[in-house]
Amino acid sequence: MPHNLSRADAIVVTLSGEEEISDDLTAKIREFNSECPIFAARRVISGFVEILPGGLSDTADGGIGCDDDATDALTGRVLAFCGLANPQNFFSEIERRFALAAVEKFRDHHNYTQSDADALTKIARGCGAEMLVTTVKDAVKLGGLSFGLPCFAAKMEMAVEDEDAFREFITASF
């Protein structure tokens, strides 16, 4: 790995829960490459799609049984759930945008059942949540399940923190 760092023209560090690149990590990178720019990136929510009753299916417009960009429909308290190996970034992103009533973690690659959907709805109602939010990765596993509350999938994308400097670096490289 150090050899690869020494050859890099730029380094992009993916932040997962951290607010910024630590001084220790920057110092470690600089041991192997003293000149290249270091950029920070993180996964952020770019929008939401509503998961419709009846499950997920291909649609003519390329959707997956959901209403495209339902971001405006999301107001109120939220129960967030997912089956990710490291769910903290997802939950943090939801908490930045909404009043987070509760979170429910499932094991990575969880296969959801109607019992899960019923339990999530019960927990959500018990803590005053008005809707459920999950990841697109999890949404594709919710086909045929019915929730007693609106359920949305968060679309995620990578965002570079100093986008102008990153764009300038990329443009100057060509």
What spans do the regions from the language model cover?
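C-terminal accessory "lid"/substrate-recognition subdomains
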Residues: 1-131
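Short, polar loop motifs at secondary-structure junctions
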Residues: 87, 136-141
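Conserved active-site loop/cleft motifs that coordinate metal ions or position small ligands
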Residues: 131-136, 152-154
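A short, gly/pro- and small-residue-rich
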Residues: 26-35, 142-161
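Long, hydrophilic "mature protein body" segments
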Residues: 81, 144, 167-171
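Short secondary-structure transition/capping segments
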Residues: 113-116, 144-146, 166
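Switch/connector loops and helix/strand junctions flanking conserved nucleotide-binding motifs
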Residues: 21, 141-142
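Short, flexible loop segments at boundaries between secondary-structure elements
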Residues: 46, 107-110, 149-174
